[in-house]
Amino acid sequence: MSNSRQHQGHFARKRFGQNFLVDHGVIDAIVAAIRPERGERMVEIGPGLGALTGPVIARLATPGSPLHAVELDRDLIGRLEQRFGELLELHAGDALTFDFGSIARPGDEPSLRIIGNLPYNISSPLLFHLMSFAPVVIDQHFMLQNEVVERMVAEPGTKAFSRLSVMLQYRYVMDKLIDVPPESFQPPPKVDSAIVRMIPHAPHELPAVDPAVLGEVVTAAFSQRRKMLRNTLGGYRDLVDFDALGFDLARRAEDIGVDEYVRVAQAVASARASG
């Protein structure tokens, strides 16, 4: 596989984190995992040169029900419009600030499916941005740096378990589906990649906790991950009786599962509300 940054007459731009998927076997495997169906409401983040876009449109789109896509590179937008016409509705802009809820169908039921080969330089902030739209999302299928996927699905007690693990596992059921080697891209990235499936927990499955408070507690816990929680969460002792909560502070952040972090966040929020 060539290391050239040019593919199909387009130069991949480092500032957009562009690595174009060119392995048709991998593309077929991704489409098989997504299983797009005619008439579904779906949006692709960063369609690039349309390697995944084309096969998905073939299974999903009609003139009255197009595939949606969010693309920042205006050079690519023109090419995509010319290639796919009314079967693709393009939204020019940055996925980090895009309102994905605007694409969902009106109503209380989840209606939106999100897919994409996410730019690796913004993957974590983009995943956090997407959390706010989880109530309208059916599922998400993303190509990401393998190291990020491993952190997303990591279990407590492992080195990969992180703030990202806790916050995303609180909101989604996630499965790593496919390993993707660097040579599947043009230009090849310097890291391995993987496909992950993310399905939001149903509302009745979500713990009653303020996500902002949970995020605050988890961020504090992982701020110095090699230190004991008595150091990183010590500032909450005025609000939380950790002994009564059955929460052992003589542990490190990566040793604590999602449920325990939720209990601490609930206690913090309750103490603030009553104080």
Curated annotation (Swiss-Prot):
Keyword RNA-binding: yes
Residues annotated to bind S-adenosyl-L-methionine: N19, L21, G46, E71, D94, N117
The keyword S-adenosyl-L-methionine is assigned to this record: yes
Compartment annotation: Cytoplasm
GO molecular function: 16S rRNA (adenine(1518)-N(6)/adenine(1519)-N(6))-dimethyltransferase activity; RNA binding
A GO term from the CC aspect: cytosol
Entry's EC annotation: 2.1.1.182
Keywords: Cytoplasm, Methyltransferase, RNA-binding, rRNA processing, S-adenosyl-L-methionine, Transferase
Catalytic activity from the UniProt record: adenosine(1518)/adenosine(1519) in 16S rRNA + 4 S-adenosyl-L-methionine = N(6)-dimethyladenosine(1518)/N(6)-dimethyladenosine(1519) in 16S rRNA + 4 S-adenosyl-L-homocysteine + 4 H(+)
Domain of life per record: Bacteria
Name of one Pfam family that matches: RrnaAD
Family, similarity comment: Belongs to the class I-like SAM-binding methyltransferase superfamily. rRNA adenine N(6)-methyltransferase family. RsmA subfamily.
Biological role stated in the UniProt entry: Specifically dimethylates two adjacent adenosines (A1518 and A1519) in the loop of a conserved hairpin near the 3'-end of 16S rRNA in the 30S particle. May play a critical role in biogenesis of 30S subunits.
NCBIfam families linked to this entry: ksgA
The protein, known as: Ribosomal RNA small subunit methyltransferase A
Gene that this sequence comes from: rsmA
